[in-house]
Amino acid sequence: MAAQNEQRPERIKTTPYLEGDVLSSDSGPLLSVFALQEIMQKVRQVQADYMTATREVDFTVPDVQKILDDIKTLAAEQVYKIVKVPSISFRHIVMQSRDRVLRVDTYYEEMSQVGDVITEDEPEKFYSTIIKKVRFIRGKGSFILHDIPTRDHRGMEVAEPEVLGVEFKNVLPVLTAEHRAMIQNALDGSIIENGNVATRDVDVFIGACSEPIYRIYNRLQGYIEAVQLQELRNSIGWLERLGQRKRITYSQEVLTDFRRQDTIWVLALQLPVNPQVVWDVPRSSIANLIMNIATCLPTGEYIAPNPRISSITLTQRITTTGPFAILTGSTPTAQQLNDVRKIYLALMFPGQIVLDLKIDPGERMDPAVRMVAGVVGHLLFTAGGRFTNLTQNMARQLDIALNDYLLYMYNTRVQVNYGPTGEPLDFQIGRNQYDCNVFRADFATGTGYNGWATIDVEYRDPAPYVHAQRYIRYCGIDSRELINPTTYGIGMTYHCYNEMLRMLVAAGRDSEAAYFRSMLPFHMVRFARINQIINEDLHSVFSLPDDMFNALLPDLIAGAHQNADPVVLDVSWISLWFAFNRSFEPTHRNEMLEIAPLIESVYASELSVMKVDMRHLSLMQRRFPDVLIQARPSHFWKAVLNDSPEAVKAVMNLSHSHNFINIRDMMRWVLLPSLQPSLKLVLEEEAWAAANDFEDLMLTDQVYMHRDMLPEPRLDDIERFRQEGFYYTNMLEAPPEIDRVVQYTYEIARLQANMGQFRAALRRIMDDDDWVRFGGVLRTVRVKFFDARPPDDILQGLPFSYDTNEKGGLSYATIKYATETTIFYLIYNVEFSNTPDSLVLINPTYTMTKVFINKRIVERVRVGQILAVLNRRFVAYKGKMRIMDITQSLKMGTKLAAPTV
């Protein structure tokens, strides 16, 4: 027994007023999963009908907590890397010559291997390949140089050869001593200069780098050198404002020494978040609602009032026949407690979540349940004025239930004078003839419910989030007041509650009126807590914008459907009684509360990157129509989604809305101007600027068909042949003469194929030594090097595919232009033992494909030009400098305990 007593946890109760039955404890993420399940039940009713005629969709409820953890992981990721040496931009291929080598731009060589082969009939693959190539540029150039290796030469600091970005060590063994000395002298001249960037000492040197990569590096360096000091001040100032609103102190522990002279700091994200970025996402209102619940809603318990309240008012007699007395001792089931959760979710998200009544024949047959719900429903909910917690149907059903309760003469008979309309509550009751018409719902004025004659939406001091400036004031309670449950609510009241007491007294319901008088402090504490939760904890970028909030009620009444339609949840009649007898008492602030701004910034930044990608991809069809003949906007939407972080996709698709997004939604989102500034967005935009030249992506439309004989030189002087460094390539140095080029469009090719003359026409052009260009289609280009005869499929490959077949007595031809094109370099190697005709064949070998790209991918250079590409200015931070990413400081610090908990 002693062991059992030790294991039993002690229940700590804060004040005597809070004594009661604790039903359950709900945290923000748990409630978000519950809300998501309930919301999905409603959403699926529409979606399932639609999907019966289309494809299947996975309707499993996602794990919100895992999604939040993944987004936090995204915030910790760096879009740049810190390295000691830059990547090799140029390498050299040794030939048999002692004074000539082939210099290869490794960027183009690596870029040619990125992505899939482009075809005309797979636009989604084309879009995906473009994104992969753009991300390759961004990733390749996003580096910061730190602690580069150097050496001392005659009192000067000189860069080590591997820092220069040129790989030439394989060339040195074949060079003469004179050439090696010349290169060594050039290396000794790579002096490190001392520079000053943003009051920080840095090393400056000249190195080699490919143009697209250097653009990204230069943009990143410019971002760092701009210091971002004002952005940091704005972010910290905004966090302090938000902390004041949410009762959280901002912690500056990360920022204690970032201003020291030995520290370089990078701010990758910014605050505040542009809310327009989050709310512009198509069909995102439900996802944003769930994120608001998961990141902001506190953990709480459902507290029952002091049981003596009902015992001395409703059940004081031995025999009790009234509806309230009958329900006093009832115990809720699990399903009814779920309905209580729905009711409190609807109260915390007014207008966004509205309630309707379940069709439950059992409860409809129980008049006591309906009548009690009709009374407490008018005291729990707001129906009109500025917002509503109810549908019009539920408000009318509550009016009918209240009407039945007032006319149920179970104690003493009371005089009733009926009105002429026959509407619910159209009568006067009691000796003083109280007019009950005022309790009939009127959504225009809020009459009959909590919004009656109260200011329940207020605009006062500017809120941190510019899109949500409203303050909710249920029952006219100001959320700035401090709540002491033992005394709060005593002597407080509001119009609807007063009128309900007057009407109950007029109807002869003295016991019930006494019960509600005793419940008034508990009732006011309930709504004071809800007001504080809404106006403090739930204030977030995921909060519904004011313009949408103000339009919810008029649209609901008019039956108009807008971007943010309310979610309707069904509750039972008896759950209204249980909700009235329980109050949501927050016990712990949400654990995500202090990191929520960082999560919001990461999410908005990723959305902005996606939008920039989609904007550029949407232009592709106009720039290159031949390769995107069958393209639709949905293709680049899917391509961007597939290459986006899983966590961001999961947030966007919390309610499985992606299956129902149409082209109008997508194009509207793409054209909206809102973006969230961040380092990742800056680098992505620069990568797209570099990718505007498609030749930098190793894509080209300058592919020609021309019959050319593979060179077979005589080896009369082998030494001279080796010194020249002889090689052959199908890469053109200039496009062919335009009067010798025949432009073959798809229409011409189809016409000749239908006439059965396609091959013959091409053969005639080849015999005339002319050139054929097949349309303006973009092709994937690969770069390959050979020191022996290349395979025949490369040598004799054609820049198109032409297939014919016969079926049913008819001939069919298939023509495709978008094929993979290979730029090959054949390096001739000979030995002194070779005879003059060693390279000569009886029958010549022909090559059929020629490519022109206006880039210096490979060039033959003399040994003295090996280091001629050192023309880029690099900035490197000294080894004793610290590089800090202070993005993680953009989160609030310690949550303050509520003064009354």
UniProtKB/Swiss-Prot annotation:
Please provide one cellular component term from the Gene Ontology annotations of this protein: virion component
Keyword match Nucleus: no
Please indicate which superkingdom the organism of origin belongs to: Viruses
**Annotated Gene Ontology MF terms?**
structural molecule activity
Q: Name the lineage.
A: Viruses, Riboviria, Orthornavirae, Duplornaviricota, Resentoviricetes
Q: Which family does it belong to?
A: Belongs to the orbivirus VP3 family.
Q: Which UniProt keyword terms apply here?
A: Virion
Query: Where in or outside the cell?
Result: Virion
Q: What is the purpose of this protein?
A: The VP3 protein is one of the five proteins (with VP1, VP4, VP6 and VP7) which form the inner capsid of the virus.
Q: Which InterPro entries match?
A: Inner_layer_core_VP3_Orbivir (IPR002614), Inner_layer_core_VP3_Reovir (IPR016029)
- Its protein name is Core protein VP3
Q: Does the keyword Aminoacyl-tRNA synthetase apply?
A: no
